[in-house]
């Protein structure tokens, strides 16, 4: 009997769940998103009044509320399966929040530490290794894949396209599929 190929989007979202569930309780809650924001602020040395920090906090709060809305759960926490289903729904429903583009712009502004409107290899590697705890080799592979024009930087359009691909494409070789390692 043949086994079905794994659903790449589910695999990607399960990996992001594991990375977000830093207290390893099997659920995500608002505190997990607060810890994520704190990691970004710490890694990028952003104070609470920095506009990038405020934008990150505002987006993550809205994102969390959208996940809860789409999950239709009684508690303010999500299991892995509830998270995967909610992210899929929130990614497709842009009536209140365009998840992929909103996240892409907020993260790009944080990662682009020198504000030159492009992400250098070092900036991108820092993002995946220091914030998301990926191995440097995986971060460099992801960088090379996202740099679709080969200019050794990731432009805002390249980054946004990769974020969209992360949430919406089932192609394991798509640039956004490599954010949390090879699916």
Model-derived features with residue positions:
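The feature marks the first
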Residues: 2-46, 50
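Domain-level signal for compact, non-enzymatic binding modules
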Residues: 2-3, 50, 86, 93, ...
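Aromatic-enriched hydrophobic runs in primary sequence
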Residues: 4, 35, 60-64, 94, ...
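Primarily EF-hand calcium-binding motifs
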Residues: 10-25, 53-77, 101-116, 138-156, ...
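Amphipathic regulatory helices of Ca2+-sensor modules
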Residues: 29-47, 77-94, 118-132, 155-169
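Divalent metal-cofactor coordination and adjacent catalytic microenvironments
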Residues: 97
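Acidic/histidine-enriched, glycine/proline-rich intrinsically disordered or flexible terminal extensions
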Residues: 165-183
């Amino acid at each position: 009997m043949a086994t079905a190929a794994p659903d790449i989007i589910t695999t990607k979202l399960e990996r992001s769940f594991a990375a977000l569930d830093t207290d390893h309780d099997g659920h995500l809650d608002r505190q997990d998103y607060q810890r994520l924001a704190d990691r970004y602020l710490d890694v990028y040395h952003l104070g609470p009044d920095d506009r990038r920090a405020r934008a990150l906090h505002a987006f993550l709060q809205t994102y969390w509320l959208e996940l809860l809305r789409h999950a239709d759960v009684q508690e303010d926490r999500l299991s892995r399966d509830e998270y995967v289903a909610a992210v899929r729904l929130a990614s497709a429903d842009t009536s209140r929040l365009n998840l992929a583009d909103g996240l892409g712009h907020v993260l790009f502004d944080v990662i682009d530490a020198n504000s030159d409107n492009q992400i250098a290899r070092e900036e991108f590697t820092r993002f995946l290794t220091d914030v998301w705890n990926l191995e440097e080799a995986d971060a460099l592979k992801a960088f090379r894949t996202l740099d679709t024009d080969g200019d050794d930087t990731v432009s805002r359009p390249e980054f946004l396209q990769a974020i969209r691909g992360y949430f919406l494409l089932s192609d394991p070789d798509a640039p956004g599929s490599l954010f949390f390692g090879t699916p």
